[in-house]
Amino acid sequence: MKKQLLIAAVAATMGTAAIADIAITGNMKVNYTNTDTNGTVSNKVNHEANLVIAGSNGDTSVHIEMALDDSANDTAQATTVGLEDVYLTTSVGDIKLKTGAWNGSDTILDSDSTRTSGNYIVSTDISGVALSVEGDTQEASTSVKVAGTVSGVALSYKAKATQDEITVAGSIAGVSIAYANIDHDDANKDKSSIKVDYSTNGFDLSYVTADADSGATITGDSWFGDMAAVVRNTGTNDIGLEAGTDVSGFGVKTTLAGNTVQAKFIEIDATTVAEDTSIVKLVATRALANGTTLEVTYTDADSDTAADDQETLDLELAVKF
């Protein structure tokens, strides 16, 4: 009997230790979207589920992300679980390594980078300055980044094969200001953005502007929304902004009766004047008692070309675990 109890205790201890090194998280959302493009109405229901498995052993960890995504109403995507980000992180002394496959992060100017295999980031800190080398199996993708803080101002410089990227961020009297610039080797392909944030009396206020040279295109999916998915000409079904198009916007966010409410007013100053567009986006988010979150988004895009006017109502039910 004592042996059986001892074996059970050891097994329980080993099981606990094994489980403690593995974490499973995930989320799922279902969206109903009603779109009215100058009187032509469409409806669709999409779903997306994500599962993340994170494991670790000492200073080494592994991240595996899987997804079931029907965002394009594609039968294969709706029924097939696919691998997304898969990477390993570890360290040797002061040197950190991340390698595998993952998407980059969205910015105001650019959408996240295409997921490729063989990605790596080697990084370290020297006297408060962060140094990193990033790339993949293609030599042309290699970049070097230097980042640090000077007198409370965060600075970074990233040298890529065909362009240099600079960011500056800080705050003055409670006003946060962030500047980003992409200096391309080719003529007329530079672009830059400025973001200003300020909070007062329970309201979060923000202003963003993004400027592109005649040969540069803004594709970001952070503050403005997915600029790479903007329909600018329903007649030819052109998607995304034209090169040289500038974007600006003002936003306000607050809490009202237990709901998070925000509004954004966006102006697209298109290269082709007939494609200038004013966008009003209203979003209300509420946590429900059943553990889900309901988000209602209404978007009104008013184009200088009436045929491109579009109203969208999106209802999203989401859960995280």
What does each of the following model-derived ranges do?
Residues 157, 161-218:
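Long, internal scaffold/assembly segments composed of regular secondary structure
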Residues 2-150, 157-159, 170-173, 180-182, ...:
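Beta-barrel outer-membrane channel/assembly domains of diderm bacteria
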Residues 38, 74-76, 182-189, 212-242, ...:
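Solvent-exposed loop segments that connect transmembrane elements
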Residues 79, 91, 182, 191, ...:
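Compositionally biased, intrinsically disordered or low-complexity tracts enriched in glycine
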